[in-house]
């Protein structure tokens, strides 16, 4: 498995967070349109109605996208966990889990494990990936 493949869960989670922020923003904007003050002045209902309809459609679409990404995230996590479970060395498994499943930085991984630097855990990871990729090519 490549570093790019291992990092997909992290980036997928970031996409979901960004989509969730956008969804919250859309919901807030749609509430502000529907909560406009009634002044008694004649107004055309189609403009506000169509704006609300657009927001609702966009919200529904974005919720479906988020749901699909969450499902994809669960599959990706399962795939990573199976790969990591196949790593024979316990320390390397811990490094991979903390980095690629939990999404910690190299420094956070080193601090969590203890007795290692960010560079040492990073190099342990990269060396393992290089070894495995060389085995696959051979």
Please state what every model-predicted region is.
Residues 1-83, 134-138:
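N-terminal interaction/assembly modules
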Residues 29, 98, 112:
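Short acidic/histidine-centered micro-motifs embedded in hydrophobic/aromatic stretches
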Residues 86-87, 115:
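Short, conserved sequence motifs enriched in acidic/basic residues, glycine, and aromatics
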Residues 88-102:
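Short amphipathic alpha helix immediately N-terminal
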Residues 103-105, 116:
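Residue-level signal for the short linker/turn that defines the boundary of a DNA-recognition helix
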Residues 107-111:
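Short alpha-helical "recognition helix" segments of helix-turn-helix
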Residues 113-124:
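Short, basic interhelical loop/turn and adjoining N-cap
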Residues 125, 129:
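DNA major-groove recognition helix of helix-turn-helix
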